[in-house]
Amino acid sequence: MKLLALAVLLLAVCSLEGAFVRRQAEEPNLQSLVSQYFQTMTDYGKDLVEKAKGPELQAQAKAYFEKTQEQLTPLVKKAGTDLINFLSNFMDLRTQPATQ
């Protein structure tokens, strides 16, 4: 029983000591964290601009947009036709009771 009490006491002291050490540890300054974040974002932006200047990326973007346009054009035309058919059917249903 004494051994169990001693183990619990030792565990409590160790956990309190760990909490005390954590409180004494110096926390990073908020201003330095923010400035580091902005510096990282600035560097990333500069790298991105340098990559975007290259003709390879512009050619890839142009090819992507052309491919997307080729794929979407038939879908948009079909959706427009379906919408017009739907609305015309809806309008026909409304005009039928009035003519009878």
UniProtKB/Swiss-Prot annotation:
Record's subunit section: Monomer. Interacts with NAXE and NDRG1.
Family statement: Belongs to the apolipoprotein A2 family.
Gene: APOA2
Protein name, entry field: Apolipoprotein A-II
Residue ranges the record marks as coiled coil: none
Location(s) in or outside the cell: Secreted
Example GO BP: lipoprotein metabolic process
InterPro entries: ApoA-II, ApoA-II_sf
Signal peptide: 1-18
Classification of source organism: Eukaryota, Metazoa, Chordata, Craniata, Vertebrata
Native source organism of the sequence: Odobenus rosmarus divergens
Top-rank taxon, per record: Eukaryota
PANTHER family: APOLIPOPROTEIN A-II
Keywords from the named record: Cleavage on pair of basic residues, HDL, Lipid transport, Secreted, Signal, Transport
Function: May stabilize HDL (high density lipoprotein) structure by its association with lipids, and affect the HDL metabolism.
